[in-house]
């Protein structure tokens, strides 16, 4: 795992959800559910599993994110690398996404941190800030309709 240095920055999105951690964990770790709130994927909650998130390409992004599961602690913590792919792999961002689930009196505090943004990743940081805020909201909608 790459540790961010002092020159990097992190993006944090937190939201308290009125749902148990077990339910949120399902939406964070089951491929078809992940696709509903994030992107197409071949994720497996197994440390060392390499996988991709896939979306429609956009300017400055080929639509593929290369990842590896780094930490899988059921119902508590999930962490994976989040790296540029293809031609962008050499110069694009190499970050780590960590989800932390903390029980509260009324549900679960969901914390998403994407760490390791370098100064030259400012555009990616801004895009991630917008994207994660929206996607955490989408995650909550998926969780709300689970049994």
Locations of regions flagged by a protein language model:
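Hydrophobic/aromatic beta-strand elements that line small-molecule binding cavities or substrate pockets
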Residues: 15, 65-71, 95-102
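Hydrophobic pocket/interface hotspot
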Residues: 24, 34, 51-53, 69, ...
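A short, structured loop/turn motif at beta-sheet edges
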Residues: 21, 70-77, 100-109
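Mid-chain, well-packed structural core segment of small domains
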Residues: 77-99
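Short beta-edge strand/loop motif at the mouth of beta-sheet-based domains
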Residues: 12-13, 31-64, 77
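Short, solvent-exposed aromatic-acidic interface loops
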Residues: 83-87, 113-120
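A conserved amphipathic terminal alpha-helix motif
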Residues: 116-147
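Hydrophobic ligand-binding cavity/cleft-lining segments
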Residues: 1-41
């Amino acid at each position: 795992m790459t540790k961010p240095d002092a020159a990097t920055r992190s993006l944090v999105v937190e939201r308290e959800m009125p749902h148990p951690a077990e339910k949120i964990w399902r939406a964070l770790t089951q491929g078809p559910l992940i696709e509903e709130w994030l992107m197409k994927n071949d994720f497996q909650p197994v440390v060392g599993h390499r996988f991709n998130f896939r979306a429609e390409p956009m300017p400055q992004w080929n639509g593929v994110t290369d990842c590896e599961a780094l930490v899988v602690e059921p119902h508590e913590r999930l962490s994976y690398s989040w790296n540029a792919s293809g031609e962008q792999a050499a110069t694009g961002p190499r970050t780590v996404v960590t989800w932390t689930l903390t029980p509260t009196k009324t549900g679960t505090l969901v914390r998403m941190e994407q760490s390791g943004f370098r100064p030259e990743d400012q555009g990616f940081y801004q895009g991630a800030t917008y994207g994660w805020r929206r996607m955490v909201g989408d995650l909550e909608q998926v969780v709300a309709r689970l049994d």
